[in-house]
């Protein structure tokens, strides 16, 4: 059996690198694969990231909304199985749990998250404090019968960040309580993952004299058997004297080229062996069952065109891959366990993967709503057709002499019906035209029907469209035009019927519809052109600044080579400031005959700030 732990630094990117999740998982040839730093929120889980043939997956995603930590962490455990419905395989867990407190229990089959009881051994902690610990999605626990696997992504805390240091203390304190409780029950515990702790000086390149005095390193060493604890650091137990065995390097400084890194990805094992001998002296799971544990240094983590050349120097390159390497443990095949099914926490049961289960009530409600919508649609279409036919029928049955005197055709009468939807009410139409008593009965009926249709819905759409085009000035312009028409209405009344109809069609409809959009369009064009000019000016200025910075890159004082730009990401007064450093990769210090020669990293100080 084989277990692999790997900080993927973004699961989506690693899946894209291998073209599919299945190819990524098969590349390890392992039974249990533990990923850290998946950088996925729960709503971002999709089948292509969580489901692969022959594997069952269990995720823990970040739930915090804290700035800078949304979708930041996250862990996932993939188990290779032959049958998911019912199996005796050890790789398929009997139970699975998200988080370490027992309070985060995803009822995946129902699509909801419910609160469970506090895990055994954590009763003295406040409930709110425990909930905060599991908000960042840093652990998945799977019980495989013979052993319990803790897939852990430990918090990172810099020296001057008191809040994160306190959180790291609470996290590992609660985690240790869970381990102790299981060990008292006689269970075997495997802890795998990125713990963000290098326990010994030999686990860090160029560790300082006070390196091992760090409180978290002291806590890690207190867990080990040789220090009176219950756990064994499997890699160090198998390779006690190996140096320069690192699992993580800084990608920003190209440190992997010179193996300038640290060992922070671990596999810890605690518990007895499976032998039934009464004399347990010298027996342990590590001594009796573990065959090998090593670092997969040659594992393909980069795209082919970006594969680094290790320990051969060169300029810094931004590698497109994880800044960690996998670590594996292999041990003898274990006996099968009683037949069991896939735990409810499995991704196959997540609502975003398999969908939400509908109830009978929701099905009938949806069907009734669809029937009502269809009935309304049919009634609306039939009423619209009848109104249109009656309007055109009234116009066609009107006196031919009126149509001749108007000088318009049937199409123009229907266009008058559509134009009435521009927001002109019946009172405004009457005021603008003086009187409509001289119109024929057919034209009067069609006008009234057109106004009714506009009130029922078409006028709302027209107003919505025009509201995005009109400016405040255009409303005053419209009012002035209507007032001018009202003042001159008496002159239209004294004219012939044909001139009255012309006054309706020309000043009220055509004049109003043509003039207003022209004014608003001109104003929009002027506003858009001025904004475009400002954007173009800002873009040109920024390009000028970039060209100036590019042409004024300083040289490294030691190597006389062009430096590279960096940005300060540490919170403080210099946050966001740009500076220059040596372009060569980070490496160890070299001692030569005439004294101490500093490495390129320690010599690349700030050359110029921007």
Swiss-Prot record:
Biological role: Exhibits apurinic/apyrimidinic (AP) endonuclease activity in vitro. By contrast, another report show that APE2 has no biochemical activity. Unable to catalyze the conversion of 3'-phosphor-alpha,beta-unsaturated aldehyde (3'-PUA) to 3'-OH. Has no in vitro 3'-phosphatase activity. Redundant with APE1L and at least one functional allele is required for seed viability. Has a strong non-specific affinity to DNA.
Cofactor: Mg(2+); Mn(2+)
Gene: APE2
Subcellular location as annotated: Nucleus
Tissue distribution: Expressed in both vegetative and reproductive organs.
Region (Disordered): 486-536
GO biological process: DNA repair
Name assigned to this protein: DNA-(apurinic or apyrimidinic site) endonuclease 2
Cross-referenced PROSITE patterns: AP_NUCLEASE_F1_4, ZF_GRF
Comment on bound cofactor: Probably binds two magnesium or manganese ions per subunit.
Species annotation: Arabidopsis thaliana (Mouse-ear cress)
E.C. no: 3.1.-.-
Major subcellular location class: nucleus
Disruption phenotype: No visible phenotype. Ape2 arp double mutants have no visible phenotype. Ape1l ape2 double mutants are embryo lethal.
């Amino acid at each position: 059996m084989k277990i692999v732990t790997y900080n993927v630094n973004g699961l989506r990117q690693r899946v894209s690198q291998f073209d599919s999740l299945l190819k990524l998982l098969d590349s390890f040839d392992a039974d249990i694969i533990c990923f850290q730093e998946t950088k996925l929120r729960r709503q971002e889980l999709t089948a292509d990231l969580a489901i692969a043939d022959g594997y069952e997956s269990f995720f823990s995603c970040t739930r915090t909304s804290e700035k800078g930590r949304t979708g930041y962490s996250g862990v996932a455990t993939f188990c290779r199985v032959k049958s998911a419905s019912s199996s005796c395989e050890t790789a398929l867990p009997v139970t699975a749990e998200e988080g370490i407190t027992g309070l985060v229990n995803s009822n995946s089959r129902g699509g909801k998250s419910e609160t469970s009881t506090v895990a055994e051994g954590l009763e003295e902690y406040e409930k709110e404090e425990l909930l905060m610990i599991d908000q960042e999605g840093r652990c998945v626990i799977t019980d495989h019968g013979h052993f319990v696997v803790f897939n852990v992504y430990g918090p990172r805390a810099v020296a001057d960040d008191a809040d994160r240091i306190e959180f790291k203390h609470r996290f590992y304190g609660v985690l240790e309580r869970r381990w102790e409780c299981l060990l008292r029950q006689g269970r075997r515990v495997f802890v795998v993952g990125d713990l963000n702790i290098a326990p010994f000086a030999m686990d860090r390149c160029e560790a300082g004299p006070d390196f091992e005095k760090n409180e978290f390193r002291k806590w890690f060493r207190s867990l080990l058997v040789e220090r009176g604890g219950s756990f064994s650091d499997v890699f160090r137990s198998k390779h006690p004297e190996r140096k320069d065995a690192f699992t993580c390097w800084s990608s920003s400084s190209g440190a992997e080229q010179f193996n300038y890194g640290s060992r922070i990805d671990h596999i810890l094992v605690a518990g007895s062996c499976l032998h039934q001998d009464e004399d347990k002296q010298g027996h342990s799971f590590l001594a009796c069952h573990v065959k090998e544990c090593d670092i997969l240094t040659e594992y393909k983590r980069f795209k082919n065109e970006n594969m680094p050349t290790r320990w051969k120097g060169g300029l810094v390159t931004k590698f497109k891959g994880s800044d960690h390497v996998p670590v594996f443990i292999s041990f003898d095949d274990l006996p099968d366990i009683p037949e069991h099914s896939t735990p409810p926490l499995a991704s196959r049961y997540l609502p975003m993967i398999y969908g939400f289960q509908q109830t009978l009530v929701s099905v009938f409600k949806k069907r009734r709503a669809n029937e009502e919508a269809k009935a309304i649609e049919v009634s609306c279409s039939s009423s619209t057709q009848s109104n249109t036919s009656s309007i055109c029928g009234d116009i066609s049955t009107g006196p031919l002499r009126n149509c001749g005197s108007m000088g318009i055709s049937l199409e123009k009468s229907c266009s008058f019906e559509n134009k009435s939807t521009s927001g002109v009410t019946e009172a405004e139409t009457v005021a603008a035209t003086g009187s409509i008593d001289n119109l024929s009965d057919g034209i009067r009926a069609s006008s009234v029907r057109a106004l009714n249709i506009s009130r029922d819905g078409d006028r709302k759409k027209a107003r919505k469209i025009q509201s995005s085009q009109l400016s405040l000035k255009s409303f005053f312009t419209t009012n002035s035009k209507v007032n001018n028409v009202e003042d001159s209405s008496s002159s239209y009344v004294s004219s012939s019927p044909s001139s009255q109809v012309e006054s309706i069609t020309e000043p009220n409809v055509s004049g109003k519809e043509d003039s207003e959009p022209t004014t608003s369009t001109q104003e929009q064009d002027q506003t858009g052109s001025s904004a475009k000019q400002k954007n173009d000016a800002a873009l040109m200025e920024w390009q000028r600044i970039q060209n100036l910075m590019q042409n004024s890159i300083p040289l490294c004082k030691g190597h006389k080579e062009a430096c590279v730009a960096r940005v300060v990401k540490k919170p403080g007064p210099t946050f966001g400031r740009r500076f220059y450093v040596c372009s060569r990769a980070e490496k160890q210090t070299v001692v030569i005959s005439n004294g101490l020669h500093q490495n390129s990293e320690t010599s690349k100080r700030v050359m110029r700030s921007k």
